Amino acid sequence: MTARPDFEKFIVIVTYGRSGSTLLQTALQTIPGAMIRGENNNLLYPLFRAWKRAHNTRYNQGQTPIPAHGPWYGADEIVPRRFGEELAGLFVREILKPTSQTRVLGFKEIRFHDAEPGEMPEFLDFIREFFPPCRLVFNTRRAADVARSSWWKDVETEKVMEMVEDLDRQYADYVAAHSDTSFLVRYDDYVKDRASLRALFDFLGEAYDEAAIEAAFARRLPH
């Protein structure tokens, strides 16, 4: 088993397109030793699905020893926990690529809602389980402002707003159920008042550097 690169904390920004998440990502980069990567096209989702299939195979078809002539031969020897840890380690090493100076690792993703209906909470549980110690930061924005973005120009405004409002409810429900490892922020709040991010930094157990935050917000984003 290949050892996973070491880090103190793992932070994942959970959101949707044009929520201001790149600004939040930049703000979290002010944490000393932080490497918060950008999007990866929801690459972790198929890894979660692979782990889920392994888990279901082991505990549905492999509950008892299976002989060599059995159709599920070997299913009883699958170790879902170890498989999940290997997938997580591979994702960290080959996708996030932390350096020896990385103390806080993570990424942001705007495609969590690509999960099958009702599956996102289970996907998030997988992340918390296999990337410890993990903190999920849910980033929201006013639905009407998201829908006005040209990024959503090929989708009807009402559909975008419905999606955002539904995701906001799902985010709030998840945070309420996992308040020890999850936190909710609103772009509309911190873009007007940087200090509103202090609560997030307190939750993460990190110092809030006002000057560094101001510099991060002043930096022009590439999109």
Each predicted region: which residue ranges?
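PAPS-dependent sulfotransferase catalytic domain
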Residues: 55-59, 98-210
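PAPS-dependent sulfotransferase catalytic core
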Residues: 1-93, 210-212, 216-223
